[in-house]
Amino acid sequence: MFIELKNHKAHVFEHNKIEDPESNIFILPGAGMDHRIGSMIDMSQLYSSSNVFSLDFPGHGFTTGEVLYSIEEMSEFLIQLLKKMNIENPILIGHSMGGLIALDVSLKLDCKLSILMNTSYPLMVGEILLQHAKGNLDQANEFMTKYGVFNVPETKVQAKTFGTMGAGFYGRSKGTIKSPYGTKNIENDPQREINVYPLKRLFNQTQKEIMSHDLKACSAYKAEDISKIKNTSFIYGEKDKLARFNPENDIHASTEEKNIVIMDNTGHFPFFESPKELSKIL
């Protein structure tokens, strides 16, 4: 569905719809991604009691309007959306950048629960990734999946040719793949490229530099008073190289140990790498 806000037409995907739900759950995507991550997170066991939504932030997916360049601006966008939907005390599940947005919202209004998934704070982004994101989105995706994915599920394709899940989108020349988003070389391990395609396709956006904007927003974000967080849980990947768990971080100071989950043999994208385990945890 689409909801008119002051400066945006917000796209919100409804996973289900019930009257008088116990909770309203919002899945907030990470940098460069959109509502499609919701299709990889099985929340169906909650459909009888709760409404589940996945949303697109401006510049992502189907939401139109001016691009937002800071976590605070994206937080305000979500607050406006919640008010327009007449929803109070939401449950927010934020992945990576989405976790920072959930954190910022939870410091500004009451949330029933905020789940920060693969979100470190502060979330600093290396200069190499920032440069890739600005000039070559495919190279940024390569970096994200190379260092972010530990457990690669096998993807079965129905034909021998690469691109059966998006034929025509790519052009190939001596192992180099060219797309509207940049270039990459898959000569070393073409099977891995096929296996990670279901994840990489989530980064394809009409705004080619949206990943760059998002990553800069993550690096720049500083919460007003991290000691005031409440009703917050954390999910980390044991093998995550992009957002590592730091037990001494102040963000965990007021969180009980039972509300911090470390997923074994999982990197930065648990909804892709270990979806069944993630579903049970959530």
Question: Locations of the language-model features?
Answer:
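N-terminal cap/lid segment of alpha/beta-hydrolase-fold proteins
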Residues: 1-9
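Active-site loop/oxyanion-hole signature of alpha/beta-hydrolase fold enzymes
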Residues: 8, 51-93, 97, 280
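Conserved HGGG/HGGXW glycine-rich cap/lid loop of the alpha/beta-hydrolase fold
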Residues: 8-64
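Conserved alpha/beta-hydrolase "nucleophile elbow" surrounding the catalytic nucleophile
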Residues: 29-31, 90, 94-96, 237
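Conserved loop-alpha-helix segment in the C-terminal half of the alpha/beta-hydrolase fold
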Residues: 43-44, 231-266
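Conserved hydrolase catalytic core segment
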Residues: 88-125
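Conserved alpha/beta-hydrolase catalytic His-Asp/Glu region
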Residues: 131-227
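Post-His helix in hydrolase/transferase enzymes
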Residues: 256, 272-282
